[in-house]
Amino acid sequence: KKRVEYMKSKNLNVINVIEKNKPKYDFIYSDQTFEHIGDPKDTLELLNSSLNLGGYILLNFPSSFGFKRKIKNNYTPSKDEAHPLEHLNLFNRSSMNYLIRNTKLKLINFRSLNSLKLRDMYKDIKNLIYFDSVLLKKTI
């Protein structure tokens, strides 16, 4: 909200692409954007309000695999999960469950590097190393 107000103060036209009373969707896809959002819970609730009952949200974001170990070992930014520094959030199964708490969304699938079998790693090596994904379903 602060950023929106700042942009408006600079005479920039700010458009909210998801507004109330707009069409509902069966599927919403977000690729490499959620880690940049300052308030992912509010954004997720906004996306949820734009879903039909039984609709899905698919989110892809950088993997946080191994990041906890990095910050325990005198972490300095380099090109990784949290850098460039505009990556405001990292997600894992636990943080995603926290985000969807008290929403009408159910976590259907969480694919992460540390949950894959070795034989699956060869299917799409780039995405397996760098990106996790979560599939959510609107249930009520």
Where are the predicted features?
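Conserved beta-strand segments of alpha/beta enzyme cores
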Residues: 13, 106-109
